[in-house]
Regions:
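Intracellular loop-helix junctions on the cytosolic face of multi-pass helical membrane proteins
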Residues: 1-50, 63, 72, 100-105, ...
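Transmembrane alpha-helices of Major Facilitator/SLC transporters
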Residues: 79-105
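C-terminal transmembrane helical hairpin of 12-TM major facilitator-type secondary transporters
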Residues: 109-154
Length: 268
């Protein structure tokens, strides 16, 4: 299957001139290019990197210490049950992402993804802070945890930065963003595990996970909402500038005005 898909990719038609005009060329970023992008979008990138740091740490703890977080023997779950839960979660996420791929407007997809991941993180917090009140079954709890975490994690590993580059017409590729996310996230995981072993090796994993999940969910939801507000403001500002330039160009062509005169006419 992998070989077949690889062969099919080689059969894709080359982009036409119209395709090149409608899209931004994906190029390899050098050091200067990476720094330029980071400085240009520093507020939103810091928020997203910060949020993904905690999401990756939380996800790794759930995956690596699941048998300590839940009582597997008491719940009666087998390894096949865990596989079925992950399979259902994967299908749900693929369905949602498939629908979003049909949306052509890049900004709408970015907004939808940020709202989606915010709902996911708030779900984590709600379950964590109301764990004893809800009294969810182990299967339901595990399904909701996996769905919320994987929705957030995979949103930024797949769709988000592709649409981000297209929306703001950035000459680059997603490799810089994804590698940075992974590096920060996994370094955070290592740091948490080292601190746990050095300062408090014997802990109640369920209490620790719920406490961390609750506060991480709130912090990440605030970060994602901040990112959404920033992106909307940035998009409107750049769109206004673009419209202004187009009007200036049309004025010059229609009336034969010089740039200086056209600017004067626009001000009036």
């Amino acid at each position: 299957m992998l070989s077949l898909l690889g062969w099919l990719m080689t059969r894709l038609p080359q982009p036409t001139e119209e395709d090149k005009k409608l899209r931004i060329e994906r190029v390899t970023l050098n050091r200067e290019g990476r720094m330029h992008i980071f400085k240009s979008f520093m507020p939103v990138l810091l928020l997203l990197f910060f949020a993904n740091l905690f999401i990756t740490v939380l996800q790794d703890i759930k995956e690596d210490f699941l048998v300590k977080i839940i009582n597997v023997e008491a719940s009666g779950l087998s390894s096949w049950a865990f596989a079925k839960i992950d399979a259902i979660v994967t299908l749900v996420i693929l369905f949602v992402f498939g629908i979003m791929s049909l949306i052509k407007n890049d900004m709408k997809v970015l907004c939808a993804l940020l709202v989606l991941v915010t709902c996911g993180t708030l779900t984590l917090s709600f379950i964590a802070f109301n764990y004893n009140t809800l009294e969810l079954s182990t299967t339901t709890w595990l399904f909701l945890q996996s769905l919320s975490l994987y929705t957030v994690y995979l949103s930024f590993q797949t769709l988000f930065f592709e649409r981000f580059i297209a929306c703001f017409r950035i000459r680059g590729n997603v490799g810089f963003f994804i590698i940075t996310l992974d590096f920060i996230g996994y370094m955070g995981t290592v740091l948490v595990l080292v601190l746990k072993e050095c300062f408090k090796p014997n802990i109640d994993w369920l209490h620790f996970y719920n406490l961390m999940s609750g506060y991480v969910g709130v912090a990440c939801a605030m970060a994602f909402m901040g990112a959404l507000i920033y992106l909307l403001a940035r998009y409107r500002r750049e769109r206004t500038v673009c419209v202004g330039k187009n009007r200036l160009f049309i004025t010059q062509n229609c009336f034969g005005l010089s740039p200086k005169i056209a600017n004067t006419q626009q001000v009036k």
